[in-house]
């Protein structure tokens, strides 16, 4: 297991605040199973894996933003039904 330092991550991110935001979003993606890790998991927690990906320059805001784009979901049928008019 490789040790991850803040300094390693800051080489790829502008400041600590952005590092926290980016690593949080990526860790959530990994924890919920939405995305596959880009580094070996090595029995680490999702937060550590996210920081390792950032430190190696594999994850940035463009990669996170691409994953957050969600297709519009159709409205429920109840909203399309004319019998549900406002009183």
Curated annotation (Swiss-Prot):
Catalysed reaction(s)?
A: RNA(n) + a ribonucleoside 5'-triphosphate = RNA(n+1) + diphosphate
Q: Name one GO biological process term.
A: DNA-templated transcription
Q: List UniProt keywords, sorted A-Z.
A: DNA-directed RNA polymerase, Nucleotidyltransferase, Transcription, Transferase
Against NCBIfam families, the record matches this protein to: rpoZ
Q: How does it assemble?
A: The RNAP catalytic core consists of 2 alpha, 1 beta, 1 beta' and 1 omega subunit. When a sigma factor is associated with the core the holoenzyme is formed, which can initiate transcription.
Instruction: Describe the family membership recorded for this protein in Swiss-Prot or TrEMBL.
Output: Belongs to the RNA polymerase subunit omega family.
The name this protein goes by in its record: DNA-directed RNA polymerase subunit omega
Q: Could you state one GO cellular component term attached to this entry?
A: DNA-directed RNA polymerase complex
Where does the secretion signal sit in this chain? none
InterPro entries in UniProt: DNA-dir_RNA_pol_omega, Pol_omega/Rpo6/RPB6, RPB6/omega-like_sf
EC numbers listed for it are: 2.7.7.6
Annotated GO molecular function terms are: DNA binding; DNA-directed RNA polymerase activity
| Gene name in the database record | rpoZ
Describe the function of this protein: Promotes RNA polymerase assembly. Latches the N- and C-terminal regions of the beta' subunit thereby facilitating its interaction with the beta and alpha subunits.
Q: Name one Pfam family in it.
A: RNA_pol_Rpb6
């Amino acid at each position: 297991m490789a040790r991850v330092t803040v300094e390693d991550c800051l080489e790829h991110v502008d400041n600590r605040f952005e590092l926290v935001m980016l690593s949080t979003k990526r860790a959530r993606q990994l924890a919920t199973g939405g995305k596959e890790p880009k580094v070996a998991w090595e029995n680490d927690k999702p937060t550590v894996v996210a920081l390792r990906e950032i430190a190696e320059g594999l994850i940035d805001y463009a990669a996170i933003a691409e994953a957050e784009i969600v297709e519009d979901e159709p409205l429920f049928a109840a909203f399309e039904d004319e019998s549900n008019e406002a009183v």
